[in-house]
């Protein structure tokens, strides 16, 4: 399996630049329309496309394991993609699929509609995250604690499910800056009544960093402080048996428009 993300590429001299790794925030409906077209028209390769969430989806291909890992598109904002494309005979099928997808997407009615509305079009797919299915020990068995996850991220959801951690759906949770913070906090407080550990993932500011949007990133951080950290701190102060830890898993720079090492 590989991650199959719809992206927006922009021509630049003799290369194509990764403009938007979300392809203009595709809706799930738009994405499913694209996936159906790819599945119907790429019939000469053993591939199956599975819908995920918006721009982020899965492609399964019958092949030997790849020896090289492919770069995530959100690490390539503003970069020419040529040097990051799959290289070598083992990737011939992937290159073919990407090229075919670009042709199919160029003529797709949804993309034509987005262009008329001056929206970024999903003019390519980006394949990455290749690997074998991993296994994790059950979290509760290993640590003796029950846990649940609140996150719109399919990556976090997948890891949680692999470890036997419950995944809680939240209405209005998008994984971006317009996510419903209030519902996420309310759900976290409810989960604390039945679980030893609740992992609440908030990633709205990350996307804004990768678009170089400093002003909105600051506003989103302020929202996280007032709508997430504040209410949770107040609730936890009423329960002496609960502690809160705030952590980051990586740093994304709105100045460099990429992740910082």
What residues fall within each predicted segment?
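Feature captures the catalytic ectodomains and active-site-proximal regions of enzymes
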Residues: 1-261
